[in-house]
Amino acid sequence: MSQIDQSFGTPAIIIRPYSGTTGPGSIAANSNTEVNATSQPVDVNDQGWVMFYPGVTPANNVRPGTFRCTTAGTAIISWNNPTAGALTPTAPTATTPYLFVIVKSGL
């Protein structure tokens, strides 16, 4: 598993790539859409953000969704869309990966 571990004392910040090439699909306007993403590089009690590319102008704008993990390998992701219209993010690819920013305490 590829990862970058950067410790700033406690807690530690760990960045890992999202596994797979399926995005959240359409996110309704002014809402959070919660999904269970399986086969992800997360452990029980992990929490933090998922950075994703919304695929709107500007194309490289990155937005965060939050996640938590209660079962190893499954990220419960809340994809956030604060805009007035529905949002269909660009699916993750090798050049535009989604990234987990995991906050670990007690390391």
Please place each PLM-identified region on the residue numbering:
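Hydrophobic beta-strand residues in large extracellular and virion-surface proteins
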Residues: A37, G48-V50, F67, A75-I77, ...
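Surface-exposed loop/edge segments in extracytoplasmic proteins
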Residues: I15, A59-G65
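Extracellular receptor-binding modules and their adjoining Ser/Thr/Gly/Asp/Asn-rich linkers
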Residues: M1-V42, N80, T90-L107
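Extended extracellular/luminal ectodomain segments enriched in beta-structured repeat modules
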Residues: D43-Q47
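Structured beta-strand segments within beta-sheet-rich domains
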Residues: R63-T96
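A sequence-level detector for low-complexity, Ser/Thr- and acidic-rich stretches
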Residues: M51-T57
